A protein has these predicted regions:
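Two-component/phosphorelay signaling modules centered on CheY-like receiver
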Residues: 11-29
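Acidic catalytic/metal-coordinating carboxylates
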Residues: 33, 59-62
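Conserved acidic carboxylate
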Residues: 8
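Short hydrophobic/Thr-rich beta-strand motif most characteristic of the beta2 strand and flanking loop
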Residues: 25-36, 40
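Active-site beta3 strand of CheY-like receiver
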Residues: 44-50, 55
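C-terminal output helix
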Residues: 80-82, 96, 100-110
Length: 112
């Protein structure tokens, strides 16, 4: 069962994403910030990291370096072509805009 780390500061979004992924046979861990993720988990051990772009403290793109090769999917409500391109240039494997459609998220996760 693939193990996914969700890093999202909005509890409602984090919980909804967790439920969606768990219903679809993914094992899920979660954190509210990059710092919390670093303190609680070995980030490179995850099969996928799904992170909000704008987080308290460090941006979600910091997880790209910390993941040491584990794929990182960036999601944000600040959906712009520039944000998407910048995230991908930094090494994100994909980018998804919030609010996201459940099927769209599941397809993105399955692709990775």
């Amino acid at each position: 069962m693939p193990h996914i780390l969700i890093v999202e500061d909005e509890t409602i979004i984090r919980s909804a994403l967790r439920r969606l992924l768990e219903r679809n046979q993914y094992q899920v861990s979660e954190a509210g910030s990059v710092q919390e993720a670093q303190e609680r988990f070995s980030i490179p051990s995850f099969d996928l990291v799904v992170s909000d772009l704008r987080l308290p403290g460090a941006p979600g793109t910091e997880l790209i370096k910390l993941a040491q090769g584990a794929p990182v999917l960036i999601m944000t409500s600040y959906a712009s072509l520039r944000s998407a391109v910048d995230s991908m240039k930094m090494g994100a494997v994909d980018y998804i805009a919030k609010p996201f459609d459940h099927d769209e998220m599941l397809q993105a996760v399955a692709r990775i």
